[in-house]
Amino acid sequence: MKFNEISEKLSPLVTNSSLTTHPDLNPDITAVAAVDEAVTGQLSYIEGGKFAAMVQKTAASALILPRDEALQAQATEKDIAWITTPEPRLLFAHAIKLFYQPFHPSPGIHPTAVIDSSVKLGKDIYIGPHVVIEQGVTIGDNACIHANVVIYPGVSIGDRTILHANCTIHERSQIGDNCVIHSGAAIGSEGFGFVPTPDGWFKMEQSGYVVLEDGVEIGCNSAVDRPAVGTTRVGRNTKIDNLVQVAHNCQISENCVFASQVGLAGGVKVGKRVILAGQVGVANQANIGDGVIASAQTGIPHDIAPGEIVSSSPAVPNKLYLKASAIYKRLPEMYQTLKRLQKKLEES
């Protein structure tokens, strides 16, 4: 595909993007690649900042650049075709779709699938080998159920939702349209509910529900647990990485992003557009406000106000954490200074 053809397809997708002003640079593009790995015939992108120097190092034939005249001049000097946009990474995400389409098998039901006679199947769905679908399940149009998926009784799955191989959807689960559940994930598994008694722990049955709203994505080997009563809910367009635990009764709002190994204890409430980086832990019943960002390995034992950026364990404002970290590095030097001052006081 010629670069100008790619530019024409991409330019309407991001506001205020502009085509290259060098019509003579119209290389053939056969693939996309990371900027430090790209070779002749490949398209990549640069967001600026610390990556700006990669313009001089890359072997890419074309780049998606920010609105930075210096970067554009460097690319032109190296005979690299370019298109500019305020959001290079977003435009590159669109570009990937021109060269790669995820595997989506043709509609049909594999003969080894076990499907109860009461199941309601939508149009043009795919059900792979050794899938098990129990009684009372409803599956929407154009859904894709890959090999070895198990769907428990009464589950509802929306249109165009994809269940990847070996995931499990337990009873009392409702999954919306355009969701993606990756391999090994468990949706609607029993919440961790036990009541102490003189004879040990009495199991509290988990009779509640799990709801994944439209556009939710759940990563490999993650779990969203159902509660004893009530509902565990994951809001619209929220994206959850691999190895994440969402406990019973959690309420997660729309457009959140959780990275790997995040753990939410029971009853946590998460506002809109919250970002939790890797290994963030949130304590029982904590409320996290809209727009909060928690850096990696933050421990959140209490409520966090909307818009806060927090770090460390227990969580503190990120600016305070950075100041404290800078001081921490100087503690040995400060300790020696303190010892000298103390000695002078004792001698005076």
UniProtKB/Swiss-Prot annotation:
InterPro entries: Hexapep, LpxD, Trimer_LpxA-like_sf, UDP_GlcNAc_AcTrfase_non-rep. Pathway: Bacterial outer membrane biogenesis; LPS lipid A biosynthesis. Belongs to the transferase hexapeptide repeat family. LpxD subfamily. Its EC number is 2.3.1.191. PROSITE patterns: HEXAPEP_TRANSFERASES. Catalyzes the N-acylation of UDP-3-O-acylglucosamine using 3-hydroxyacyl-ACP as the acyl donor. Is involved in the biosynthesis of lipid A, a phosphorylated glycolipid that anchors the lipopolysaccharide to the outer membrane of the cell. GO terms for biological process: lipid A biosynthetic process. Keywords: Acyltransferase, Lipid A biosynthesis, Lipid biosynthesis, Lipid metabolism, Repeat, Transferase. GO terms for cellular component: carboxysome; membrane. It comes from Rippkaea orientalis (strain PCC 8801 / RF-1) (Cyanothece sp. (strain PCC 8801)). This is UDP-3-O-acylglucosamine N-acyltransferase. Pfam families: Hexapep (PF00132), LpxD (PF04613).
